[in-house]
Amino acid sequence: MEPIEQQLTELRTTLRHHEYLYHVMDAPEIPDAEYDRLMRELRELEAQRPDLITPDSPTQRVGAAPLTAFNQIRHEVPMLSLDNVFDEESFLAFNKRVQDRLKSTENVIWCCELKLDGLAVSILYENGVLVSAATRGDGTTGEDITSNVRTIRAIPLKLHGDNIPARLEVRGEVFLPQAGFEKINEDARRTGGKVFANPRNAAAGSLRQLDPRITAKRPLTFFCYGVGILEGGELPDTHLGRLLQFKAWGLPVSDRVTLCDSPQAVLDFYHNVEKDRPTLGFDIDGVVIKVNSLALQEQLGFVARAPRWAVAFKFPAQEQMTFVRDVEFQVGRTGAITPVARLEPVQVAGVLVSNATLHNADEIERLGLRIGDKVVIRRAGDVIPQVVNVVLSERPEETRPIVFPTHCPVCGSDVERVEGEAVTRCTGGLICSAQRKESLKHFVSRRAMDVDGMGDKIIDQLVEREYVHTPADLFRLTAGKLTGLDRMGPKSAQNVVNALEKAKATTFARFLYALGIREVGEATAAGLAAYFGTLEALQAATIDELQKVPDVGIVVATHVFNFFAEESNRDVIGQLLAEGVHWPAPVVINVQEIDSPFAGKTVVLTGSLSQMSRDDAKARLVALGAKVAGSVSKKTDLVIAGEAAGSKLAKAQELGITVIDEAEMIRLLGA
């Protein structure tokens, strides 16, 4: 056997293995970028020796074989995949190939849309009624998932409107919004169920359940992007026109679909979507670019496994492979001990990543991770990089187990793990310098007491030099003492003292949040402040009374009660008040007497506002009798969506909650 034959055989075997893991087992072992690299390598070798191309080569088909647990459906029109480009140069080369094949010098009109990271499905409607649904499978045969697809509320069981074809096969992507993904994993961790690595795996696993009742509990959704069978009817002669027609018939279509009349316009679309990617509320891995004219699509035709008139322009990979060199343990402000993987540095989504969170001991056990392992790292948006899975097939011989500490790595105190919790905590409290540092950093942060100019490095020095032990000590600092810190001159020191003086005037909600009570975020702090009105009333509240606050359950109520029951905490609060920390007296609001469209409503703000600050909006809403919550739930009455609204908007849409924009909010505020 020639060396190139051996190389081709090994590449095909490797790709088939990973196709099986991805398409059939829903348990990919390598990131998409590595699969794409292997596929490109195989194509290049086959281009050198076309006589060695075999019919079963991964380059000659679309996906892996369907599961045998489901009935199979043969696609009357094959479900092809798309070729990929990864940079501007490759896209421009693709654009030129299209123009050359069309023998045209005029710009092509492109229809650009999001490349959703979910599961491709085909849905067949006969006389407007959903009769079957299938996965892509290998492109010619897929799994029958009709019962499961019928449970997805975004997909209509019957189309509405006029001129619906006798047989219409709609193609699109089933996916799981990030809010739904987080909820599924949260429930799984609590019940000991399967935790999914990413939303795509969760969507695929949900859709391939043999019991549709399980699928029905998962908040899957769907966007359509194309057509297969079309009989007994007509569709518009442009891709965008077809999408708009689908929408008119009740099918969900992404609102990020744009016509571009030049290659530069396509590149602008690509970069705008890439910028907005972290706020979409669901995962995408690129944009799809299609010739808009159906006549030109037909003229361009297909290659073996993909159309010539479309391409997927993929973003820089959010997943990459690297090695775990060590694991260290960090201590947070509540004593939580978090394992952090120290990695062989690797570029992920344009950022050099050398650390990744491992969350807790349960996560290490779930991953089966050992020091020295080859792992897949994922970084999405502003999310801290995390280890997705271990590449077990490439585990080195010299790996060693990860041993969780029995004593705090900073102060040496015993660690404990409360039954029912995943987190291990240091019992040292303020004896532990790590907890003191993190508590003080939280206290002065922008959304807490907002002490301008007091950064992490200043806090570290203040604790290490024993200048500060509690938050109250901050307000006793002098410019002279601060001047002794590294890189702190007299002017900078005085600015910090001035900022501390300014921060004394705060709000009750900010003060509560700054105290760092476990499980009390901004929204909960605001809810507690609004409900009790005064610090005295809150300190005197029982656990039962605390649970009367919206969105406060037994766990949060217990943490709040225990915090105020601790004498040292009450002492620190007393010192803070003695140093001059204060806030306005509460304004008693009788909601029943307020004539406002917001009175008595639970409202959630999401996205960025252009006409006023988030705090101003909250204050005005509360003044009109609203309760402003931090998360969307079934109890939410209204969501106000600003620019770049993300997962909260997606969850509101899933739950059918009324959504208004900033302009409508301002109109109602003045009503």
UniProtKB/Swiss-Prot annotation:
GO terms for molecular function: DNA binding; DNA ligase (NAD+) activity; metal ion binding. Belongs to the NAD-dependent DNA ligase family. LigA subfamily. It catalyses: NAD(+) + (deoxyribonucleotide)n-3'-hydroxyl + 5'-phospho-(deoxyribonucleotide)m = (deoxyribonucleotide)n+m + AMP + beta-nicotinamide D-nucleotide. This is DNA ligase. Zn(2+) binds at residues 408, 411, 426, 432. It is an enzyme of class 6 (ligase). It comes from Salmonella paratyphi B (strain ATCC BAA-1250 / SPB7). Gene3D superfamilies: 5' to 3' exonuclease, C-terminal subdomain, 6.20.10.30, BRCT domain, DNA ligase/mRNA capping enzyme, Helix hairpin bin, Nucleic acid-binding proteins. The active site is at residue 115. NAD(+) binds at residues 32-36, 81-82, 113, 136, 173, 290, 314. Its EC number is 6.5.1.2. NCBIfam families: dnlj, PRK07956.1. Residues 593-671 form the BRCT domain. It comes from the Bacteria. Its cofactor is Mg(2+); Mn(2+). Pfam families: BRCT, DNA_ligase_aden, DNA_ligase_OB, DNA_ligase_ZBD, HHH_2, HHH_5, Nlig-Ia. GO terms for cellular component: cytosol. One of its GO terms (biological process) is DNA replication. DNA ligase that catalyzes the formation of phosphodiester linkages between 5'-phosphoryl and 3'-hydroxyl groups in double-stranded DNA using NAD as a coenzyme and as the energy source for the reaction. It is essential for DNA replication and repair of damaged DNA. Keywords: DNA damage, DNA repair, DNA replication, Ligase, Magnesium, Manganese, Metal-binding, NAD, Zinc.
